[in-house]
Design a protein with these regions (language model features):
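N-terminal functional module of multi-domain proteins
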Residues: 2-120
Length: 120
């Protein structure tokens, strides 16, 4: 099954809240910091393939944070494999930091705090 969530058609003042809610439903609770919340654009397409899901996320500059407060309600332990397609991504978890360019990949662990950002 394919699902697409977009900010197109969402009032500018409501876009950052809309994106925050969409990301939480698609993945798990995260804090989001927008470079330009008043003019944010994003699109998330997801495919559910049994126990595995794929997603393609494109958006304006943004930082995602998975913090200890997000672990209050237990959930399944998940791993996300991230492959940048257009720009460098920055990811920090467990005292390590990675900057990945298109062609590289990294693994995110949902059950530990992390920080993920991109500037484009």
């Amino acid at each position: 099954m394919k699902t697409t969530i977009t900010t197109n058609g969402v009032d500018l003042a409501a876009r950052s809240r809309h994106w925050h809610d969409a990301i939480g439903r698609a993945y798990f609770p995260l804090d989001l910091s927008f470079r330009r919340p008043e003019a944010f654009d994003g699109e998330l397409t997801m495919w559910q393939l049994g126990q595995v899901s794929l997603s393609r996320l494109t958006s304006d500059a943004l930082m995602y944070r998975r913090l200890p407060k997000h672990f209050r309600e237990p959930g399944p332990e998940e791993f996300l494999v991230t492959l940048p397609a257009k720009a460098e991504l920055r990811f920090a978890q467990g005292g390590k930091e990675v900057r990945a360019n298109p062609g590289a990949f990294f693994i995110e662990r949902s059950h530990e705090p992390y920080e993920f950002s991109h500037s484009e």
